[in-house]
Amino acid sequence: MSSSTSPYELKDLKNSSTEVHAAEQENEIEYFETDSNDRPSQQPHLDYEQHNTSAVRRFLDSFKRADQDQEQEAEVAQMNDLTSAISPSSRQAHELEKDETTDKIAPHTGHKSDSLKKTIQPRHVLMIALGTGIGTGLLVGNGTALVHAGPAGLLIGYAIMGSILYCIIQACGEMALVYSNLTGGYNAYPSFLVDDGFGFAVAWVYCLQWLCVCPLELVTASMTIKYWTTSVNPDVFVIIFYVLVITINIFGARGYAEAEFFFNCCKILMMTGFFILGIIIDVGGAGNDGYIGGKYWHEPGAFNGVHAIDRFKGVVATLVTAAFAFGGSEFIAITTAEQSNPRKAIPGAAKQMIYRILFLFLATIIIVGFLVPYNSDQLLGSSGGGTKASPYVIAIASHGVRVAPHFVNAVILLSVLSMANSSFYSSARLFLTLSEQGYAPKIFSYIDRAGRPLIAMCVSALFAVIAFCAASPKEDQVFTWLLAISGLSQLFTWTAICLSHIRFRRAMKVQGRSLGELGFKSQTGVWGSIYSCIMMILILIGQFWVAIAPIGEGKLDAQAFFENYLAMPILIVLYVGYKMWNKDWKLFIRADKIDLTSHRQIFDEELIKQEDDEYRERLRTGPYWRRVLAFWC
């Protein structure tokens, strides 16, 4: 070695020698019991990890606990995902965005998922965001809602929930921008803005929600298959879908972005095609029934129920299904808050939400109401003995159209499997989040070398076994239970977001802070959150009424109560249990004691005003089409 060798070169050579020595020792151990002639010749300059370790060994080693550096990287990735436990489809959009950003600043780790991170494009994020909500609640759960409420009641329920959702998107956008780096996302807001016990209870119920969604989607998938065949045991299909979901989450999916892009394109095209074909069938241009018009709004009627109280009860019951169908939409605001210009993107996301509510939800629900009577024995939740199917399939098949129903049913199957995969992913990450926040045992924070929360995934897989009830004659009841838990849990999450926003604005006022510090102010203001909070409390009260006096007989039924209201007792037990354990009985954090500095991004009020003035000037002096685009988009 020459005397001119630098200390850095000496250090590198020492490290290289150490690595080679370690590799030789490991080779000694590995081939200790093998014939000496089988032992490969030692080549000190070969990379042991790459050349001497088989793919199977690397795969098995990936389940070992990550070392300190890997664990830190994995935890960063998991914390980027913890707000993504919201909507299955939107959650994946956020994950992909975060992965793309992380890949630009993080060193190459050698993971096979790196190539996926580099392929994420805006078109993936856009289509995944548009496809949010087109799943079990809308495509299958609406069958039960139509039976209970009738076509007009179903439409009213979705319209009410849509108005609430718009205010929630505004509040969530404001909070997401100022707390964009907060561990736990919007699940963490109540812990420091409302009350720690309330935050604990809501976070656990939210985790329970996504635990329930996975078996719910698997059951729905088996029910969807019944449209084609009823001779095969449904559990056979559940096994296939169950193994598929777990396999994807163990190995990942190299082409996940393109797959989700494909799935969501299919959903959007299906909903658009259904709307057009539905209009053609309704006016007599296709099918065997000629002109239909609003026939089913007159016979059997627009509402289900003889008395006004029964009709009102049907609308109330519809609201939970609508909440589940809209579930995860609030995450669009979270994703938008992390784009390059969130102050302009969040209002656009709110407008996008209006269009989704109007065209993908309300418009197609109107068509379903025109083409499917609420007393059809094929609807889920009906008392008839017909084969249960999606109301979207029934709307086409019952009028003599042959090929299209199979395409619609196939897209529905893809939709529910996509959501099953996403919900499994989310529930495991939520367990990790709870552990990081101190709300769950530390064992759930185990992260392997591939960045998977392995213990949490095992719990999620065990919970998904509930789906094997698909062959039971009580399948419809289990579906109703899981749907009610998920729907009510979504209402709790939305209530927590709105209540946190109200308390945040109150603390800003009490502590004399200017709203100009906010990068984006909710267009509906604090009154929008108050409206949403009041409406959701009324919905919870109404759902309690429906639970103790079910639609139909109106008699108290314990089974019907737990089918419709199981999530509320769970929330109460978690809240009271936390208070008893910590001996902390305060109801809320006082506004003057709320911490408004930690984790919060404070914007320059003068700079924001200058940016807004410049933006308005560019619109004023720019072409007319740009002003039109800014108004509508």
From Swiss-Prot:
Segments passing through the bilayer: 125-145, 149-169, 198-218, 232-252, 261-281, 314-334, 353-373, 393-413, 453-473, 478-498, 532-552, 558-578
Tagged with keyword Membrane: yes
Topology versus the membrane: Multi-pass membrane protein
Lipid group attachment sites (S-palmitoyl cysteine): 633
Designated gene of the protein: AGP1
Function: Broad substrate range permease which transports asparagine and glutamine with intermediate specificity. Also transports Ala, Cys, Gly, Ser, Thr, Cys, Met, Phe, Tyr, Ile, Leu and Val. Important for the utilization of amino acids as a nitrogen source.
PANTHER family listed in its UniProt record: AMINO ACID PERMEASE (PTHR43341), GENERAL AMINO ACID PERMEASE AGP1-RELATED (PTHR43341:SF17)
Biased composition range(s): Polar residues: 81-91
Protein name as catalogued: General amino acid permease AGP1
Coiled-coil ranges (or none): none
Matches recorded under Pfam families: AA_permease (PF00324)
Ranges in the topological domain labelled Extracellular: 146-148, 219-231, 282-313, 374-392, 474-477, 553-557
Residues in the Cytoplasmic compartment per record: 1-124, 170-197, 253-260, 335-352, 414-452, 499-531, 579-633
Alphabetically ordered keywords of this record: Amino-acid transport, Cell membrane, Lipoprotein, Membrane, Palmitate, Transmembrane, Transmembrane helix, Transport
Compositional bias (Basic and acidic residues): 92-116
